[in-house]
Amino acid sequence: MKPPALTPRLLLRAYALGIFPMAESRDDPEIHWIDPRHRGIFPLDGFHISRSLARRIRRMDWRVSVDEDFAATVEACADREETWINPTIFRLYVELHALGHAHSLEVREGETLVGGVYGVTLGRAFFGESMFSHRTDASKVALAFLIDRLRAGGFTLFDTQFLTPHLASLGAIEIRRSDYHQRLTVALEGNASFTPEGYWADPASVVQRNSQTS
């Protein structure tokens, strides 16, 4: 029997169960479903902004945008020697974006995309999928603005899937699968907005709000 066709709705059901898709490589057509024993998350009140990053944000001449070019952000995340984003996964995330369940936050130098992050939203959970940086600290800037936005929008869970040394240095932690599923259940019971009404994110305010909570 053929497995059911992979659709955006099926993908959202998987996220609600705490599993996510990955491919072995760009050229691997097979999709693997992952439910790690230990899960990386970002406590939304625990993002670490170093003094150097705070200075970078306050003085930066980059522009931060939201959902201006979702597909280009995903493409930039996949543009590396090894990637888990194959054509099927790319298509699914673009379709999720069209449905309002996937969003990107971009960092631009002029009109050039130099950093960014994208993820999936469901209830009050944000599932961070991937990020990239073509300038020093561009991905850190993207994360600072993203976490500020998630807090303002009422999100309670920022799932990073795995914990890397880079994410740990910024405040991400690792929790057990059972703890993660409990947090996910609570997050799915409510609603949040990635574009909260009246929200404004100028650099100085982002630094101040993150400093107050970390």
From Swiss-Prot:
InterPro entries according to UniProt: Acyl_CoA_acyltransferase, Leu/Phe-tRNA_Trfase, Leu/Phe-tRNA_Trfase_C
Protein EC: 2.3.2.6
BP GO annotations = protein catabolic process
**Record localization:** Cytoplasm
- Enzyme kind, highest EC tier: transferase
Q: Which UniProt keywords apply?
A: Acyltransferase, Cytoplasm, Transferase
> Which residue ranges traverse the bilayer?
none
What is one Pfam family matched by this protein?
Leu_Phe_trans
Gene3D superfamilies xref list: Leucyl/phenylalanyl-tRNA-protein transferase, C-terminal domain (3.40.630.70)
Q: Which GO terms describe its molecular function?
A: leucyl-tRNA--protein transferase activity
Q: Reply yes or no: does the keyword Cytoplasm apply.
A: yes
**One GO CC term of this entry?**
cytoplasm
Reaction equations catalysed? N-terminal L-lysyl-[protein] + L-leucyl-tRNA(Leu) = N-terminal L-leucyl-L-lysyl-[protein] + tRNA(Leu) + H(+); N-terminal L-arginyl-[protein] + L-leucyl-tRNA(Leu) = N-terminal L-leucyl-L-arginyl-[protein] + tRNA(Leu) + H(+); L-phenylalanyl-tRNA(Phe) + an N-terminal L-alpha-aminoacyl-[protein] = an N-terminal L-phenylalanyl-L-alpha-aminoacyl-[protein] + tRNA(Phe)
Which HAMAP family does its entry note?
Leu_Phe_trans
Biological role stated in the UniProt entry: Functions in the N-end rule pathway of protein degradation where it conjugates Leu, Phe and, less efficiently, Met from aminoacyl-tRNAs to the N-termini of proteins containing an N-terminal arginine or lysine.
Q: Which family does it belong to?
A: Belongs to the L/F-transferase family.
Please report the name of this protein according to its UniProt entry.
Leucyl/phenylalanyl-tRNA--protein transferase
- Organism taxonomic ancestry: Bacteria, Pseudomonadati, Pseudomonadota, Alphaproteobacteria, Rhodobacterales
